[in-house]
A protein has these predicted regions:
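Phosphate-coordinating catalytic segments in nucleotide- and nucleic-acid-processing enzymes
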Residues: 1-68, 72, 162-166, 184-189
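A short linear-motif detector with a strong N-terminal bias
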Residues: 2-4, 55-58, 89-92, 108-112
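C-terminal lobe/lid and adjacent interdomain/linker elements of RecA-like ASCE P-loop ATPase modules
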Residues: 17, 35-38, 73, 92-189
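Hydrophobic "anchor" residues on beta-strands that sit immediately upstream
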Residues: 76-77
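Walker B catalytic acidic pair
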Residues: 80-82
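Conserved D-loop-proximal element of ABC-family nucleotide-binding domains
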Residues: 84-88
């Protein structure tokens, strides 16, 4: 929640928006004093803050706050679509918090979903990567290490190649979509 003041709040915010100099939480999160570099401070509500900050900054701050709670005590952090509103480098920063002993002394675990398999290339171990693969009307969980033995394979390329069947759209379906769109936008209709 944006209403949490904590040590290092400004440092976290600057990772996601380098133009932020300071954010102070007031009145139990009902008001905020926001200062951008080289500007006068402004006092705004939480709603106003969300309108002034980018969705990536708001999402990043919330993600880091939740991560810090889990990293302090151990446990699990579940994040659906970890890349939402964040660029890949910033997602990698969050992934690194869980991979390093210095920031994860209690062995906390990050479990995330993503539509961007390139993020998986940043995960060094292959025994903790799972794919959700389509199977008929349902899905199945496939452990990457059980299907791919070679360590030099990029996880994103394995995913995109549909080596693990059901992880990528079928070629015939993609071709049919392109043909449909071409027909619909054609001047000859």
């Amino acid at each position: 929640r944006l209403s949490e003041q904590f040590n290092g709040l400004d440092d976290v915010l600057r990772v996601f928006d380098s133009g932020i100099e300071h954010l102070e939480v007031r009145d139990s999160g009902r008001a905020f004093v926001l200062t951008f570099t080289g500007r006068e401070p402004i006092t705004i509500s939480e709603r106003g803050l969300v309108e002034v900050l980018s969705s990536g900054t708001v999402r990043g701050l919330g993600l880091v706050q939740r991560a810090m709670r889990v990293l302090r005590s151990g446990g699990y952090l579940l994040v659906d679509e970890v890349e939402n509103h964040l660029n890949r480098q910033l997602v990698n920063v969050v992934l690194d918090l869980f991979a390093a002993r210095g920031t994860n002394p209690k062995g906390a675990t990050l479990i995330f979903t993503t539509h961007y398999p390139q993020l998986l290339d940043h995960v060094h171990r292959k025994d903790n990567v799972f794919f959700l693969a389509r199977r008929g009307c349902g899905a199945r969980v496939v452990k990457y290490a059980d299907r791919v033995k070679r360590i030099e394979n990029k996880k994103s390329e394995v995913f995109a190649s549909n080596f693990v069947k059901g992880t990528a759209p079928r070629y015939a379906d993609v071709r049919a979509l392109k043909e449909l769109v071409a027909e619909e936008v054609s001047d000859e209709r």
